[in-house]
Amino acid sequence: MTVDPASHITIPEADLARLRHCNHHDPHGFYGWHETEAGSVIRTRQVGATQVNLLIDDTSHVMTPIGDDIFAIDLGHRERADYRLEVTWPDQEPQVKADPYYFLPTVGEMDIYLFSEGRHERLWEILGANIKTYQTALGTVRGTAFTVWAPNAIGCAVVGGFNGWNASQHPMRSMGGSGLWELFIPGIEEGEVYKFAVQTREGQRRDKADPMARRAELAPATGSIVASSEYQWQDSEWLRERSQTDLASKPMSVYEVHLGSWRWGKNYEDLATELVDYVADLGYTHVEFLPVAEHPFGGSWGYQVTGYYAPTSRWGTPDQFRALVDAFHARGIGVIMDWVPAHFPKDDWALARFDGEALYEHPDWRRGEQKDWGTLVFDFGRNEVRNFLVANALYWIEEFHIDGLRVDAVASMLYLDYSREHGEWEPNIYGGRENLEAVQFLQEMNATVLRLHPGALTIAEESTSWPGVTAPTWDGGLGFSLKWNMGWMHDTLEYFSKNPVHRAFHHSELTFSLVYAFSERFVLPISHDEVVHGKGSLWDRMPGDTWNKAAGLRTFLAYMWSHPGKKLLFMGQEFGQREEWAEGQGLPWDIVDGWQGEYHEAIRTLTRSLNGVYSDSPALHTQDFTGEGFTWNKGDDATNNILAFTRFGSDGSQMLCVFNLSGTSQPEYQLGVAAGGEWKLVLNTDDAEFLGAENDIATSVQAAATPRDNFAYSLSLHVPAMSAQFYSLQK
């Protein structure tokens, strides 16, 4: 049938050409129902269809093909009504479906305003792919609303297997100056793979994964997957208690885990039983996952994220990940995850140059690229980008009940000259090196999390002396809950790696951390970064033969658990893994049952005991962040490599911690203490239970009224070589 090009059911050639090439800002202006002076017209593009019938008023009408796979019909002058399209493709039964171009925009004006201002705190509910249900005159219509931010694009479309990846089938409409593109597609359900076909100003089509996708295909595939959740949480009591708890005065020992290599081949469902049981048995209060957001390259350990809103599909579905978190909560264990807002990879199907131009990344290469890592840096000063990141932090806490975010590479965000040579960075407006936009972002993120989710943690991996990392934002600080103490980690590992005969010359490396221990709210981290890239495992760093390595590692762990600050230990170190961590294989569990395995089982037993003593002793955790919780008893005995200090609880309890870091026992070591009475031995790393050498230490010691070391009382202690003892003052 030939249609007069001037007919009101046709589309002007200029608009038709733009629709054909998916670079029209308003496809809804031509597809769907339209009123003209000559009457009502309905048009639809159905690529490859042989016939399309309009179903309206209980009647079927054959629509006219007008070229370019477009079908149209003139309904004359009549009132608008609900309708369906019956589409026939070759060798297929006809399909009846609602018209995507019948529906009003799914994004409201207030949503657009909040996003443009960078203040939409539930951004995932309007951007990305959201399943929606509408009640119409002809019945319920269920489908997916797609929305993407691409302000520099000249056209956007939704593509997937449902339309043969043909961008002309489902072009999206522009939502004006907001930069948003939107389309509701009936019939698209959970599990459908899709991308956004973005037409750039240079005339190129770039198929992009959805930045807001809640699920992604398993790598190396790069598609996004429509997802919704039916998960029924069982942790309401946990969340209630979390909102009322200040962890500053609570025990916090964190087991850091790379989910893919804890035990090789395990998925979220397996881990919800095996990992949860293991962490609970050892007495940890929290677990911390290396990044679980979707990432294409396993060798990045998750630190080069392409899907910020999608748990990686490597180990299961989003709801299976929810069940893993829920299982930890059921055992009283909090869940922290590493979060990477500092930078993102250059993969051309992801965030990089999303709409053909710098969008998520800063447009100035001096601020928009991290050459050391080969990644791009977010444009923290752009409202929409800042909103994307702040909302992402909230998303993990709200949708997955995550208890804390450990923010990676904070130093790289704070300093404009981070890892840059002269001429490779631009000063801020005041001529300084501080990245003021990143500072504002971090303050906003931390303040928003605190306001909406009291009790949820934000933890900074920040390796410099930036002031006020954990100070409140209202006092000019960054507002983090906690900060990793990288100085303590470096100095302590350096000291323990020395042969005991040389340690006297490095005594200050062990004591210096107490100079600044209360300047921030610190976590003591022995993380994955310390057991890779040729650094060796903790076991490997300890000097001497097998017995001495085991004794040194036991003493190191006791020192860490008694030092002010919360604790974090990477998986494998709890049993003294001998080799470096490798993400491509599981932990060497067989070492515990193999030759000399008794040493490794003893270290794991000590880890369990340390967690128990730590959690049960207010003196070791209630005053981590104040000098009132600590005093030196002996900090200057470098000659004997002996340290001793007392930790004080907010309840008045006291724990004396004594360390002999030499190879020589001290059978009658005289030590001043603050209080008289009985001091009971609660932990001895040299005990037979831990395969120590000397087991004849008195289980309690009575303080004598003999002044020593500026204290009114003193103890005479047997302090074995390479060991630690904790003594609790009995009331």
Swiss-Prot record:
Class of this enzyme: transferase
Ranges annotated as spanning the membrane: none
Active site (catalytic residues): 408 (nucleophile), 461 (proton donor)
Organism of provenance: Corynebacterium glutamicum (strain ATCC 13032 / DSM 20300 / JCM 1318 / BCRC 11384 / CCUG 27702 / LMG 3730 / NBRC 12168 / NCIMB 10025 / NRRL B-2784 / 534)
Pathway: Glycan biosynthesis; glycogen biosynthesis
Annotated protein name in UniProt: 1,4-alpha-glucan branching enzyme GlgB
EC number(s) reported in the record: 2.4.1.18
Transferase in keyword set: yes
Superkingdom of origin organism: Bacteria
Gene Ontology BP term (one): glycogen biosynthetic process
Keyword Glycosyltransferase: yes
Gene that this sequence comes from: glgB
Gene Ontology MF term list: 1,4-alpha-glucan branching enzyme activity; cation binding; hydrolase activity, hydrolyzing O-glycosyl compounds
Record key words, sorted: Carbohydrate metabolism, Glycogen biosynthesis, Glycogen metabolism, Glycosyltransferase, Transferase
Function: Catalyzes the formation of the alpha-1,6-glucosidic linkages in glycogen by scission of a 1,4-alpha-linked oligosaccharide from growing alpha-1,4-glucan chains and the subsequent attachment of the oligosaccharide to the alpha-1,6 position.
UniProt cross-references to InterPro entries, sorted A to Z: A-amylase/branching_C, Branching_enzy, GlgB, GlgB_N, GlgB_N_E_set_prok, Glyco_hydro_13_cat_dom, Glyco_hydro_13_N, Glyco_hydro_b
Family: Belongs to the glycosyl hydrolase 13 family. GlgB subfamily.
NCBIfam families from the UniProt entry: branching_enzym, PRK05402.1, PRK12313.1
Subunit details: Monomer.
